[in-house]
């Protein structure tokens, strides 16, 4: 073996052995417990970033540790390859999205392989491949048969110049990102999946998952089960009687209604705008706004009075109807009751437009004022009804019951459970996605593609230009025959939401070569024992994958109803930021590698200059690594300079997996230095370490016993930390082990070999290359087999036994020293040793002991 640690050589040798042995190809094995750990599959953006490195290393560490503990472990990988970024890149570079995507996959796969990850590449999938998305189409058709998939109109952002639908993020200040045209809202037919049919189950099943509590809460809030009252305000228009329906969770405040607001798309708004240009102009303005709930939450709340009133269902008083830009047709009934006295948004709206504000609940000790909103105005826990006629004095629950009963008696409404969750719209007016398997026939209407004709293959040679969906212009794709009547027909040009692709890929990993969607192997591996990904996926991806899994179960495809037993949301990787700001306020961000930072005497950064010109830059603080802040670190540069093991060691040591990790160049150098020490000890002592000599543990000398005691004590903690996924303290344990072994004076070669072998196995899951090569070079592989499957070291409990124990020695309650006594020594022996100790003589001022307190195994306190 080399005297010097050369990461490139070590890693090439180890990876060569793993490839030759097909070391990570995994098969089902009923004789072993299984452990299926999956990292959320990446989007092939071009290069890995440090967040990827951290995520995959966590997964890899878990895999290797459990494999050593006898588990049949599986770590697969794939590519979430469809989506809008590929279309944007294609437009920018003039190449088909397919070429851009496949080139990126090739590069990123090479990066992953250079990290030494234990991936079973025989299971690799790319969601843009027909043999994968065929099953998206197949299940969609099954859902269509069962009524889970259906078609209805939905609201989209429409660019009238480019004649195309825009995603929410492509609408900038109400204009199309490419054309600059004012964006309109349009109603178009789209396909939806009835995720709401599973709302109760999705909510209730969260309780049985080993997921972070904050993720569960985020999903609970998104599903949003609400108990309230659905009722209508009666009105008459053009001789027709009808109800303006609303849903509220605060029926106790119904006597405080002073207006109603409807969405711009509400049928009543459309009717009331006829012949009123100012109303129609406002409706058109609303339709140019964003269609996402998040957009509505942050936009300025605007409204226009219609001049029309409905009647209050309990008092008969007129209630003015407004059109509000903050009311979404896709949520609830597309109309809301306005109670400005007790809803903060309504309060602001009423103050803005001079609408009446009525107090109808009161809280003891609180004074109501119209001057400014106070938090207690919306309280339902302690408040009672006032100014509400027969409901005065009732608390929230009783008031809701009474109001609901009266509304029901009048035929206006009743109690209702509603959900914030909405059905999943899966139609996307984009090219680079799974084609929706529907054919439009002028005679037969919408006809599902027959199962035997799947997949509907997406052409991969089209280059989008931003002016509409390329599929609509591709005659070869578009034109077909109707499966029912044989007449000329057109294919559906919408593609599926890319969340469909990521909703079941983990099941396909288990049976990648199956000629069905999944097979019996899926029930062996699934559900995932551990899923790893960022908190940003807490809602949509994780919720959709849970729904998709339950649909697969109900269709008899699988036996499980949840995709993942346990979830780890790894923390973000942070780095310093630096920038300069020009006169217009525009910031230019500089990469930390191009900046020199000066520090004060306490190590705090106090200034920074750009290396190219020596001029100052502003310290922007520590933020998440991102392209926008230009503060990323290229993992490939790190691997090329220090080796993959150093990158892995640093990312595991710098912080616990679930916490944020602050990048540190000094930390990387420290990780590299530690690995050089591990290697150097092995190389320097290779003759002693390679000698396979047995020993009698009982006959060992003090130095050997002390070293074994230290190593097995630390091993016990490291094993516990591996089990609780605290890999940073595992690395700390390994550092303690090396210090103990390297500093052991008088230890015999046999004990050095034993303890160094423990160190290599403890470190192996984190830094597999260097430990694998040392294990082989020092002859451990000949004795125990390759490190890949070497058994996890067991703690020798006998080695932890001590002939002597150390007690804290106190004089008058103050620590004055340490006292070594024989393990099992009698109380008299301990007291005698204590008063004979030189610390007692020094701190007792010559006074005799009045009292001696012995706390067994812990301390002796001499009172003088």
From Swiss-Prot:
It holds the Pfam family tRNA-synt_1. GO terms for molecular function: aminoacyl-tRNA deacylase activity; ATP binding; leucine-tRNA ligase activity. It catalyses: tRNA(Leu) + L-leucine + ATP = L-leucyl-tRNA(Leu) + AMP + diphosphate. A motif ('KMSKS' region) lies at residues 624-628. A motif ('HIGH' region) lies at residues 42-52. GO terms for cellular component: cytosol. PROSITE patterns: AA_TRNA_LIGASE_I (PS00178). It comes from the Bacteria. It is found in: Cytoplasm. Its EC number is 6.1.1.4. GO terms for biological process: leucyl-tRNA aminoacylation. This is Leucine--tRNA ligase. It comes from Burkholderia ambifaria (strain MC40-6). Keywords: Aminoacyl-tRNA synthetase, ATP-binding, Cytoplasm, Ligase, Nucleotide-binding, Protein biosynthesis. The keyword Cytoplasm applies.
């Amino acid at each position: 073996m080399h005297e010097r640690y050369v990461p490139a050589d070590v890693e090439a040798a180890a990876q060569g052995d793993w490839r030759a042995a097909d070391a990570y190809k995994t098969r089902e094995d009923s004789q072993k417990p299984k452990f299926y750990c999956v990292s959320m599959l990446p989007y092939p953006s071009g290069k890995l970033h440090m967040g990827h490195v951290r995520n995959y290393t966590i997964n890899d560490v878990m895999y290797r540790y459990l494999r050593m503990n006898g588990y049949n472990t599986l770590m697969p990988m794939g590519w979430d390859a469809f989506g809008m970024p590929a279309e944007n890149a294609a437009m920018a570079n003039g190449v088909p999205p397919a070429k851009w995507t496949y080139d990126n996959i090739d590069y990123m796969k090479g990066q992953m392989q250079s990290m030494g990850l234990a991936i079973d590449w025989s299971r690799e999938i790319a969601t843009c491949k027909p043999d994968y998305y065929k099953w998206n189409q197949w299940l969609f058709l099954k859902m269509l048969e069962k009524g889970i998939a259906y078609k209805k109109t939905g609201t989209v952002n429409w660019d009238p110049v480019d004649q195309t639908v825009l995603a929410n993020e492509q609408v900038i200040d109400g204009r199309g990102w490419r054309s600059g045209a004012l964006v309109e809202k349009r109603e178009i037919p789209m396909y939806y999946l009835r995720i709401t049919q599973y709302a109760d189950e999705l909510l209730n099943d969260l309780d049985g998952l080993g997921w972070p509590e904050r993720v569960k809460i985020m999903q609970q809030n998104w599903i949003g089960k609400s108990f309230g009252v659905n009722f209508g305000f009666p009105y008459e228009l053009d001789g027709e009687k009808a109800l303006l329906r609303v849903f509220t969770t605060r029926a106790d405040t119904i006597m405080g209604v002073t207006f109603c607001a409807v969405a711009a798309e509400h049928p009543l708004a459309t009717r009331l705008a006829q012949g009123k240009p100012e109303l129609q102009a406002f409706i058109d303005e609303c339709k140019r706004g964003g269609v996402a709930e998040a957009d509505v939450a942050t936009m300025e709340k605007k409204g226009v009075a219609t001049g029309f009133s409905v009647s209050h269902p309990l008092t008969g008083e007129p209630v003015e109807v407004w059109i509000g830009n903050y009311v979404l047709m896709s949520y609830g009934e597309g109309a809301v009751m306005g109670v400005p006295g007790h809803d903060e948004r309504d309060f602001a709206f009423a103050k803005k437009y001079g609408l009446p504000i009525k107090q109808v609940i009161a809280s003891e000790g609180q004074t109501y004022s119209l001057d400014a909103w106070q938090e207690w105005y919306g309280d339902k826990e302690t408040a009672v009804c006032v100014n509400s006629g027969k409901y005065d004095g009732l608390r929230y629950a009783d008031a809701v019951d009474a109001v609901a009963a009266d509304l029901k008696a009048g035929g206006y409404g009743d109690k209702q459970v509603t959900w914030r969750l909405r059905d999943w719209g899966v139609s996307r007016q984009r090219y680079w996605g799974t084609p929706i398997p529907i054919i439009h026939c002028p005679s037969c209407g919408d006809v599902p593609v027959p199962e035997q004709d799947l997949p509907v293959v997406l052409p991969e040679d089209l280059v989008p230009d931003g002016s509409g969906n390329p599929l609509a212009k591709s005659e070869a794709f578009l034109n077909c025959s109707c499966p029912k009547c044989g007449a000329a027909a057109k294919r559906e040009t919408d593609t599926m939401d890319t969340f469909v692709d990521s909703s079941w890929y983990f099941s396909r990993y288990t049976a990648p070569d199956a000629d069905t969607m999944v097979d019996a192997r899926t029930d062996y591996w699934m559900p995932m024992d551990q899923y790893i990904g960022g908190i940003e996926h807490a809602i949509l991806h994780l919720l959709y994958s849970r729904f998709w899994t339950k649909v697969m179960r109900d269709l008899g495809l699988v036996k499980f109803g949840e995709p993942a037993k346990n979830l780890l949301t790894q923390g973000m990787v942070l780095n310093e930021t630096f920038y300069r700001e020009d006169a217009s306020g525009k910031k230019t961000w500089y990469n930390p590698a191009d900046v020199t930072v000066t520090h004060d005497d306490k190590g705090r950064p106090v200034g920074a200059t750009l290396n190219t010109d020596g001029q100052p830059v502003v310290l922007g603080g520590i933020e998440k690594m991102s392209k926008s802040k230009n503060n990323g670190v290229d993992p490939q540069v790190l691997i090329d300079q220090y080796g993959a093991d150093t990158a892995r060691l640093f990312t595991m040591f710098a912080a616990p997996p679930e916490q944020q990790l602050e990048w540190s160049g000094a930390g990387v150098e420290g990780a590299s230095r530690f690995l050089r020490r591990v290697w150097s000890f092995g190389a320097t002592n290779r003759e002693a370490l390679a000698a396979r000599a047995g020993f009698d543990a009982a006959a060992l000398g003090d130095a050997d016993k002390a070293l074994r005691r230290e190593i097995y004590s630390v091993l016990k903690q490291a094993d516990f930390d591996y089990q609780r996924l605290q890999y940073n303290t595992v690395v700390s344990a390994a550092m303690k082990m090396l210090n103990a072994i390297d500093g052991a004076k008088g230890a015999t070669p046999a004990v050095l070999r034993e303890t160094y072998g423990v160190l290599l196995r403890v470190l192996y899951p984190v830094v597999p290359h260097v430990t694998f090569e040392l294990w082989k070079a020092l002859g451990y592989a000949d004795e125990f087999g390759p490190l890949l499957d070497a058994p996890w070291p067991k703690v020798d409990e006998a080695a932890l036994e001590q002939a002597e124990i150390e007690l804290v020695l106190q004089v008058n309650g103050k620590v004055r020293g340490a006292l070594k006594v024989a393990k099992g020594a009698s109380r008299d022996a301990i007291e005698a040793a204590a008063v004979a100790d030189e610390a007692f003589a020094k701190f007792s001022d010559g006074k005799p002991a009045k009292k001696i307190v012995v706390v067994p195994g812990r301390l002796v306190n001499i009172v003088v």
